[in-house]
Amino acid sequence: MGSFSLLHWLVVLVIVLLVFGTKRLANGAKDIGSAIKEFKKSLHEDDKPTDQLGSTSQSTASGPQQDHGKH
């Protein structure tokens, strides 16, 4: 008695479409999708400087390169 059936959800969906319209819902879904894409992109950008920092510290840890051919 407390759960909703599929018919109830379809009625709610139709009412939402009538109130907001398909264009507003499509624009809202597009905005949410682009926000998620930007969020994932920022997560990957945060990882890149850490990797680059680790590779530069390894090259400086080996010390300066000496040229033994010239005296």
UniProtKB/Swiss-Prot annotation:
GO terms for cellular component: TAT protein transport complex. It is a single-pass membrane protein. HAMAP family: TatA_E. Its main location: membrane. Keywords: Cell inner membrane, Cell membrane, Membrane, Protein transport, Translocation, Transmembrane, Transmembrane helix, Transport. Residues 43-71 are annotated as: Disordered. It comes from Xylella fastidiosa (strain Temecula1 / ATCC 700964). The gene is tatA. One of its GO terms (biological process) is protein transport by the Tat complex. This is Sec-independent protein translocase protein TatA. The Tat system comprises two distinct complexes: a TatABC complex, containing multiple copies of TatA, TatB and TatC subunits, and a separate TatA complex, containing only TatA subunits. Substrates initially bind to the TatABC complex, which probably triggers association of the separate TatA complex to form the active translocon. It is found in: Cell inner membrane. Belongs to the TatA/E family. Residues 52-65 have a biased composition (Polar residues). InterPro entries: TatA/B/E, TatA/E. It comes from the Bacteria. The chain crosses the membrane at residues 1-21.
